[in-house]
Amino acid sequence: MRIVQLSDTHISHLGGVPADNMSLLADHINHDIRPDLVVHTGDVVIADPDSRPDRDAAKALLARIDAPLLVLPGNHDVGESADDPWQDLPVTSERIAAFTSAWGQDRFLVTGSAATRSDDWVFIGINSERLGSGLPEEREQWDWLADAAGQARGKSVMLFLHKPLWFPTGSQSGITVPEADRERLVALFADARLRVVSNGHLHRFRRAFQGEILAVWAPSMTFAVTADPGRGLEGESAPGIVEYRVEDDDVQAELRQVPGTGAVADVLAMPEFTAALAEIESR
């Protein structure tokens, strides 16, 4: 089974590099990879969770992907669950509702041989911004996760979300999910085999093991972030996607770059981003 993970596309209704890259990626997925499943792990839109034009532009571009597509939110899609949310844009019930109105869901569970070609794996996606938010939606997602963990009992699990569970320099607000939520989440799958945790958010590609769990960071399709090992930013910054090959009990995760795509190193030099930032600051 082939799964493609893309992340941090940061699409704007103004077009530019994000739209150009997404168009090339859709063609590459359709003609060269032909995966069984595509998962977007968030930051679909460029910056503003309240921009309907950006959501509409993202929907139009992602609709070009032929394979089954599941979309999870990032902090730029629904606001942030953090002590000091970016641009004072916290996650809210209204922002979650706007996301689910556009995409139909902010979590998923894929299981069964018809969907996965194997009864041995369960693929689960969650909204990382619900974690630690204190919203009613957080409690509702925990209840759903408890049921999902029950369905995954005795099986291998691949978990997708926007923010990482682990970071080389430890848990950090705005970078990782809260430590207590990470521990609760991992404990939920004690009767399953949590094999892979796949996130975005950090705009870098990295594979590392946390015990027996493979933790994969997916790079951004738009932005390149300079390595800074002292701050925990390890791995590769090249724009691209992660291709997973799942067969029986084995899973492989590889960075795959998309021909013709470019990366933005200085976000403030990107007119689509500065326009979104100006709109946020004007409110």
Residue ranges of model-derived segments:
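Active-site environment of divalent metal-dependent phosphoester hydrolases
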Residues: S12-G15, I46-D50, N75-D83, L131-G134, ...
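His/acidic metal-ligating clusters that form di-metal
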Residues: D27-V38, V122-I124, S133-V216, M270-R283
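N-terminal active-site segment of His-dependent metallophosphoesterases
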Residues: M1-L61
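Extended active-site neighborhood of metal-dependent phosphoesterases/phosphodiesterases
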Residues: D50-Q151, S156, D181-A190, G211, ...
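A cross-family glycoside hydrolase active-site/sugar-binding cleft signature
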Residues: S7, T41, L72, F160-H162, ...
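Short aromatic-enriched loop/helix-cap "lid" or pocket-rim segments at secondary-structure transitions
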Residues: V17-P18, S81-Q87, G170-G174, F209-E212, ...
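Binuclear metal-dependent phosphoesterase catalytic core
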Residues: S23, L188, F205-R283
